[in-house]
Amino acid sequence: MTIKSDKWIRRMAEQTGMIEPFEPGQVRQSNGQKIVSYGTSSYGYDIRCADEFKIFTNINSTIVDPKNFDENSFVDIKSDVCIIPPNSFALARTIEYFRIPRNVLTICLGKSTYARCGIIVNVTPFEPEWEGYVTLEFSNTTPLPAKIYAGEGCAQVLFFESDEVCETSYKDRGGKYQGQHGVTLPKT
């Protein structure tokens, strides 16, 4: 299994629609202002956060149960920024829609710009033949409110191509998050 380069990422995005919309270079400014970078990097793709957020709330004093998740545990926000309360959590989604090839697995890591501020981005791997918008998980590990910027970079996707095609892909087994649109809550 080998990590794929910027040339491969550009070719796959342009020829197969692996990433849409796609930025072939690295964007570091918008309207003359510095931003958290996004787009193609040497061996990965820096994804952007859309303007749809779900922020945890404790209004109902609900127990968080991944097998029986209460949607009322979140407050929905549509904004160019998201303020995550201290020691709290938010969900978002990517601007980019992904179509992962059958012989590829991705790993997604948070950007150091956020990590150095105590904001951890968690995303599980994109499995072979998974497609959809990526649901992003942001944890604010600090005792202070933390800000996330929509339309800017938040994590980097690394692409690994296998030496052998898998027998059963995510699509083959009817993965529960296949084709997701919007911020998707836990499913069992």
Swiss-Prot record:
Enzyme Commission number(s): 3.5.4.13
BP GO terms, sorted: dUMP biosynthetic process; dUTP biosynthetic process; nucleobase-containing small molecule interconversion
InterPro entries, sorted: dCTP_deaminase, dUTPase-like_sf, dUTPase_trimeric
Gene3D superfamilies: 2.70.40.10
Reactions catalysed according to its record: dCTP + H2O + H(+) = dUTP + NH4(+)
Assigned protein family: Belongs to the dCTP deaminase family.
Quaternary structure, from the entry: Homotrimer.
Protein's name according to its UniProt entry: dCTP deaminase
Lineage, broadest ranks: Bacteria, Pseudomonadati, Pseudomonadota, Betaproteobacteria, Burkholderiales
Gene from which the chain derives: dcd
